[in-house]
Amino acid sequence: AVVAHREPLLAAHAALVVPTVPEANAADAQHAVEKAGKAFAGWNHTPVAERAATLRRAADAMQQQLPRLCALLVKEAHKGWSDAVSEVREAIDFLRYYANDAERVMAPQTLPGPTGESNTLRLEGRGAWVCISPWNFPLAIFTGQVAAALVTGNTVLAKPAEQTPAIALEAVKLLHAAGVPAD
């Protein structure tokens, strides 16, 4: 949900102004919960291979944007450059890991029936998930939480740390561009 009210944010370590991000109030949050609930069935019925491919596209996009994302981590979270590079790489690894693991774990399994019937075990998403991430790994942990929930068929309401929301917003933009529905 896009919120009109925006204020500049100060980085946790010093008075560096970082990009503005939308702020949400209780009504915005309630609206987002309702939208995530409505979107769940459609996303859950998206084949796991397609959801995994979406995460891989996001990983590729994140790799292409690595310098820009590192610069934002340096500015917003006061990471050193090498730590920022490591964090972006870890976020990329999370996207690829969960994509690969979901295809393996969520593949339908044929189970033998005691009387010869055909049984298939299918894992399904559970609904709308809330992911709350910390400020100290604002891209890697945020991305890992969101990726795991999305690839298993769940919709996500993500609440980044208030000290580092701009990098999380960039991750969300990359996920949407890769094919995760915005609504």
In which residue ranges do the predicted regions lie?
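Hydrophobic, well-ordered secondary-structure elements that form the walls
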Residues: 51, 95, 149
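Generic recognition of stable, solvent-exposed alpha-helical segments in well-folded globular domains
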Residues: 31, 49-57, 64, 68, ...
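Alpha-helical scaffold segments in carbohydrate-active enzymes
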Residues: 57, 61, 90-98, 174
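Amphipathic alpha-helical
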Residues: 81-106
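Short, structured beta/alpha segment
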Residues: 1-75
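Glycine-rich, acidic and aromatic/proline-enriched surface loops and short helix-turn segments
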Residues: 64, 97-101, 135
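Hydrophobic alpha-helical scaffolding
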Residues: 1, 19-22, 26, 48, ...
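Rossmann-like NAD(P) dinucleotide-binding subdomain of oxidoreductase/dehydrogenase enzymes
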Residues: 74, 102-183
